[in-house]
Regions:
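Oxidoreductase cofactor-interface core, primarily capturing Rossmann-like NAD(P)-dependent enzymes
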Residues: 1-34, 38-41, 51-54, 58-61, ...
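Glycine-rich anion/phosphate-binding loops
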Residues: 76-82
């Protein structure tokens, strides 16, 4: 059975991803600070620290793919550093694909901070070298189906 690691698994997007991965028959490794969120036998809860490359390596070891739900910070340099750390760890783990859901942004910088920082985090994730897919929805559809 293929293993998919989900960063931020206990958050809104992460929980939806875990549910769909389980329905599709994957083994899920849930990176979360909240233990006990998942009761399914096909979910393994683990911790990882974005400041600790070894913990990221351990979290991704043996995974076939990963969903990266990046944390949000006011300090954009911290967010960029964390994206770079995850991208590098994914490459070291030989992950086939790392998938990130991001906010909408144009494909080129436009001099607008909120959009340009989205592109900066995407570049940081990709620079690790693992094959990366970025999805930029205008609206997270799960928000229309559940209370938030």
């Amino acid at each position: 059975m293929e293993i998919v690691t989900v960063f931020g698994a206990s958050g809104r997007m992460g929980q939806a991803q875990v549910r769909q991965l389980l329905l599709a028959g994957y083994q899920v490794r849930a990176i979360t600070r909240k233990k006990g969120v998942f009761s399914d036998n096909n979910v393994t809860e683990v911790s990882a620290d974005y400041n600790d490359p070894q913990s990221l390596d351990d979290a991704l070891a043996g995974s076939d793919a990963a969903f990266y739900n990046k944390p949000s910070f006011e300090q954009v340099t911290k967010m960029i550093d964390f994206c770079a750390a995850v991208g590098a760890a994914a490459a070291r783990a030989d992950i086939r694909l790392i998938y990130q859901t991001a906010a909408y942004a144009p494909d080129e910088e436009i001099g607008q901070y909120n959009y340009d920082r989205v592109l900066a985090t995407e570049r940081a994730l990709k620079q690790g070298g693992a094959r990366t897919t970025i999805f930029r929805p205008v609206l997270f559809m799960d928000n229309t189906l559940t209370k938030w």
